[in-house]
Amino acid sequence: TECPSASSSWARVDPTRPHPMMTTCTPPSYGPLRSGLGYRAGVGFGFVATVSHVAKRILFGRALASDRLGETLLPIRVALPVFASDALSSVAYATEEIMLVLALGGIALLSGSLWAAAAVAFVMFVVVLSYRQNVHAYPSGGGDYEVATVNLGQNFGLIVASALLVDYVLTVAVSISSAVANLASSFDMLHGHNVPVAIACILGITMMNLRGVKESGTLFAIPVYAFMLAIFTMIIHAAIRLASGDVLRAESSTWDITPADSFSGLALAFLSLRAFTSGCTALTGVEAISNGVPAFRPPKSRNAARTLALLGSIAITMFVGVTVLALVTQVHVAVDDAALVGMPQGYHQKTVIRSEEHTSELQSRLHLVCRLLLEKK
């Protein structure tokens, strides 16, 4: 017999099945909610669109057929903000992390920020070169996990995978915290509300990513490129003013820093190493491109390698530029506000980028930077 209509009460017998009473029938199409329909043989077709299905369609969009997966592959201009946003956004706090550590020894040690930044930049250069080889040797997208598993065994692969999971969680936490801190430096009304704002931003970013890699890439491309433009504009604008003979000083340049202790000899060496490791936050997210090689347009490996080269050159330039500008303008920061001698009562300590922007008279651009940081991946 033929498959019954929606009002019928039974389905046809399938002779290919071992028992003649076992039935199959493909339900009729009821439009875009077809995948959410249900029916029962012997009872009739039930038309129930579940709440979860409707919510999934609204939030995540329509699922793509397998033959349309090629439409989600990313060109370099979109892949850069998608996979490199972690590393690029680290510029917003890597310099500050170095200075906060060195500030424990007082103002005199802040001059070591440039050496720490140079060491971090060199490590980033080496890491980028290494990952450029990885994307050619392991183009399947396994990244560090695949490299460790193939060469060292499954146990080492699991260790690497666990480390990556922890790294991803910390990256989100630190990046969002930095974004909210930059916003709070510009808008006093946000002080005391950092945690709720950060949680709301994480939820928003999660929803954008669940829409799919191409959709999220389009959403992230504009703010990430605008963030890079804002940072480069700030650095170039300050460089032009310095070249013309202007003296740029941060508002915190007249404040003294009370050292937490006296560091010399071995203690100073360990403090310098700690500053270097803190600055290595600038390396966060470099591995994301090697994990996402399958998402690139063909030739996948070559495009991934080019994106890595762009990431390395842009991130190193911005990171070193922000660090040099912080030293030239004599930005003073400390872990504890009480350590800043001369800071006005009730004044909230600003981030390094906020201080630099204020010095170079680019306040409106910093506001843009802070908003962009909240929208990155």
Summary of predicted features, one role per range:
Residues 225, 232-284, 342:
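Helix-loop-helix junctions that connect adjacent transmembrane segments
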Residues 38-95, 102, 129, 140, ...:
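Membrane-interface "cap" regions at the ends of multi-pass membrane proteins
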Residues 205, 210-244, 307-310:
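Membrane-interface loop-to-helix entry segments
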Residues 98-149, 153-161, 174-201, 312-320:
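Extracellular loop-to-transmembrane helix junctions
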Residues 132-137, 185, 202-224, 294-298:
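Membrane-water interface regions at transmembrane-helix termini and the short interhelical loops
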Residues 361-377:
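Positively charged, low-complexity/disordered segments
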Residues 239-249, 308-349:
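Extracellular/periplasmic helix-exit of transmembrane alpha-helices
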Residues 80-92, 257-301, 305-306:
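Hydrophobic, membrane-embedded alpha-helices of multi-pass small-molecule transporters
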